[in-house]
Amino acid sequence: MLESIRLYKDLHDFELQGPTRVVEWIGDKSICVAGYDSAKRNEILQLLIPQKLHAKENPGLCPERDLKVEHGGFIDEPVYSLKHIPQSSLIVTSGPASCPLWVWQIGPEDRDVIQPISTLPSDAGKGTWTRIATTTSASPQILHGSQADSIRLTDIESTKQIHTLGVSGSDGVSTLCFLDSRTVFVCCMNGRQFIADIRMPGAASEGRVGEEGLSCVTWCSAVHPSKEDVCSTVASVSSEGHMCLTDPRNLSVPLKCATWCTPIPAASEQFLSICWAPALSDCISVSGFGGSVQIFDTKRWDSAMKEREAVFIHKGHSVMGTCEDGREPTVTAHAWHPWKERTVLSAASDGSLHVWNWSDLPVHDGTEL
């Protein structure tokens, strides 16, 4: 145990009231989490992280060592997705197919409540749930949908539909995100991917990761935002542990590929997740395969689908925690700190929330240290 702790610069173990599937940054000092228990009311909380974890310089001794509840609210439904509307105090949540999307207002500093202000209808069919994405715009808007042919853009204030993507097919959606304020990326569970312009109907380009017809394999993706003259890059991971990096301008041709020996296949698509590190070049993180989070450096990858080793694996949830039924916890969500290079937050099914920063380690590509 002591040897494992030496691998970290920082490792903080917090206990939430219940497990969460969402970890959403609100600014760079607080996060939103929400419960997903279908048998009871769930909390939606905005938590201020300790000063040591958001200070840009070493603050020395800090009196606050725990998470502090800034705002909170209750919902009668499980929360599967939560997104903050940029430059606003609004958040949007989605849950099971039978539930609407909820729009919430985070109260001002003198009020500690998160209160619902409106709902949007969900189009989710049986066995699916609505994915959501937000972007900066003059008027708050949300992109939402559960299937490729049902994705739409809605104005939050008026609740009026602004645009329908107009893409054919009932493929279940796993990932929705904006490349910019007008361009949308969609990844479907079966590996189908497309780019669409919200000003025009239909897909501008389309491709697929993985082999068509493998219904047992689920894919999800994350997009690394473009910077200056560097184009966006899509990272995709499958429930069997395959990864592909692609250029959004040509989704059918992988630039880099990898596979790794997963401890167990992802149990289902609900916890499968991949993220780009916002402040660490070429690094991605993957969770949903048991109680760990894997960090990969993609710099030296090529287009060959071969085994690569992670540069770091956070096993804290499986080592330090146990669920009420005695099973090993599964990581349910993780997110990178917005600007701290190696700092990651991860949540697990036992209600634990870890904030960790790993030490410098030799970077390898799975073939050499």
UniProtKB/Swiss-Prot annotation:
Protein name: Integrator complex assembly factor WDR73
UniProt KW keywords: Cytoplasm, Cytoskeleton, Repeat, WD repeat
WD repeats: 74-114, 266-306, 326-366
Homology family: Belongs to the WD repeat WDR73 family.
Cross-referenced Gene3D superfamilies: YVTN repeat-like/Quinoprotein amine dehydrogenase
Name of the gene this protein is made from: wdr73
GO cellular component, one term: cleavage furrow
Subcellular location: Cytoplasm; Cytoplasm, Cytoskeleton, Spindle; Cytoplasm, Cytoskeleton, Spindle pole; Cleavage furrow
GO BP, sorted A to Z: cytoplasmic microtubule organization
Record-linked SMART domains: WD40
Signal sequence extent: none
Keyword Cytoplasm set for record: yes
Function: Component of a multiprotein complex required for the assembly of the RNA endonuclease module of the integrator complex. Associates with ints9 and ints11 in the cytoplasm, stabilizing the ints9-ints11 heterodimer and blocking the active site of ints11. Brat1 then joins the complex and plugs the active site of ints11, leading to wdr73 release and nuclear import of ints9 and ints11.
Disulfide bonds, paired cysteine numbers: none
Gene Ontology MF terms: protein-macromolecule adaptor activity
